[in-house]
């Protein structure tokens, strides 16, 4: 099932969040937005966290490197990493075509509600248009 960008929540730092409930627990799938991928251009490396790591909101969990810059990746949610997309670092070109489905980075079992600072799609688009 294709992920609809208009239904996701977004951090100011360009990570997207898709929350699903499974067996009474809430899980957040996290990736970086198509806007971020476009701005970084020519991705060459991505560092992923380990399964089992506990993340806090705003904590750096990895980085993505392009020919232009190295950018940290920040957790938009609090919880335990339960899965990482291990195929992603070897297929970064696919992020250009599919930042929202193939481009997921990690899945986190939430330990708290989503932060109120996460934006809906309209607010995120406004932020991106203002950033140019």
Swiss-Prot record:
This protein's record includes keyword Oxidoreductase: no
Modified residues (N6-lipoyllysine): 68
InterPro entries given in the database record: 2-oxoA_DH_lipoyl-BS, Biotin_lipoyl, GCV_H, GCV_H/Fam206, GCV_H_sub, Single_hybrid_motif
GO cellular component terms, semicolon-separated: cytosol; glycine cleavage complex
Gene3D superfamilies with a match to the protein in the record: 2.40.50.100
Keyword Cell membrane annotated: no
Cofactor: (R)-lipoate
Chain ranges of the Lipoyl-binding domain: 27-109
Free-text comment on the cofactor: Binds 1 lipoyl cofactor covalently.
Disulfide bonds: none
Keywords: Lipoyl
GO biological process: glycine decarboxylation via glycine cleavage system
NCBIfam families given in the database record: gcvH, PRK01202.1
UniProt family annotation: Belongs to the GcvH family.
UniProt subunit comment: The glycine cleavage system is composed of four proteins: P, T, L and H.
Function text: The glycine cleavage system catalyzes the degradation of glycine. The H protein shuttles the methylamine group of glycine from the P protein to the T protein.
Designated name of the protein: Glycine cleavage system H protein
